[in-house]
Amino acid sequence: MGSITGLKRGKFTLMKLKDPNFKFTSIQYNKNHRAAKHQDSKNMGVSYIIGLGDYKGGELIIYDENGKNPVKHNIKNRFYKFNGSIYPHETAPFKGERYSLVFYNI
């Protein structure tokens, strides 16, 4: 039980260091997950994502509101703020161990 509590506390601390004013209701933890193109239709407002681990590739690809003009964003060891309820997005192919944390509101 202590390790789960420590993990939760660590994730909250990580997000609060990045943006102390960002309020979130949910945290998604992914291991080696390559998300297909989608929109977060139930999310409210912006989200933060960070990629962690020993991997190559795995950028966050964000499209315009019409689902066109993809742009890759490097999220490895850095936070990226985006609105996944408006902009379709997906994970680029990657090799290695890739973890991601997504902080969002529902």
Stretches found by the model and what they are:
Residues M1-D19:
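Non-heme Fe(II)/2-oxoglutarate
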Residues D19-P93, E97-Y104:
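Catalytic core of non-heme Fe(II) oxygenases with the double-stranded beta-helix
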